[in-house]
Regions:
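Short, intrinsically disordered, charge-balanced linker/junction segments flanking boundaries
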Residues: 1, 188-189
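Histidine-centered metal-binding segments
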Residues: 2-65
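Nucleotide-state-sensitive switch-loop elements of NTP-binding domains
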Residues: 57-82, 87-92, 100, 104, ...
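The Walker A (P-loop) glycine that initiates the GxxxxGKT/S ATP-binding motif of P-loop NTPases
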Residues: 96
């Protein structure tokens, strides 16, 4: 399945969206209750012969859920795109493998052009604030999205980060995705 393929788990607490200097805090909203069905689970003693009708498709429900997730992401990405177009914001999604130099290229671009063009940055990372702190040192408005176990940004994360950035019209939004080549390609932002 999709999350098994990309390694992101549904048990994560969701992304943390922070500006440099903000503290990350965790809080609970009550006890999590885990429920699951035992339908299709059969327990047999050793040596007991049995047959089961396996003519149904076990993967049908998983595939439908994955399609719903991708469709929902596409709807939210279209909303983001309309917002960017209405405000004349040029948005770039930077995708590359971990350690390939995305942040270094971004730093150089921002340093060279920030006097001419208003920039805003969204940094995607599983855990750290390191990249956002590097961009903040250039006096560029930036927010960090920590995805936890997630290996890609999604359109709802970008939407919430954009609200926090308060991006002005006629600007450029640079989105540095989580360091991964496969997973981000499935999710338009």
């Amino acid at each position: 399945n999709m999350c098994g393929t990309c390694g992101c788990g549904s048990e994560s607490k969701g992304p943390a969206i922070l500006k440099p200097g903000e503290e990350k805090h965790e809080h609970s909203h009550g006890e999590h209750i885990h429920e699951h069905s035992h339908e299709g689970h059969h327990h047999h003693k050793e040596g007991h012969s049995h047959t089961h009708d396996h003519s149904h498709d076990h993967n049908h429900k998983v595939l439908a859920i994955e399609q719903d997730i991708l469709k929902n992401n596409q709807v939210l990405a279209a909303r983001n795109s309309g917002y960017f177009e209405a405000k004349n914001i040029f948005a770039l999604n930077l995708v590359s493998s971990p350690g390939s130099g995305k942040t270094s290229i971004l730093e150089r671009t921002l340093a060279d052009l920030k006097a001419e063009i208003p920039f805003y940055v969204i940094e995607g990372d599983q855990q750290t604030m390191n990249d956002a702190n590097r961009i903040d040192a250039l006096n560029i408005p930036v927010v960090q999205i920590n995805t936890g176990k997630g290996c890609h940004l999604e359109s709802d994360m970008v939407y919430n980060a954009v609200k926090k950035l308060e991006i002005k019209n006629d600007s450029i939004l640079m989105i540095e995705n989580v360091g991964n080549l496969v997973c981000p390609s499935m999710f338009d932002l």
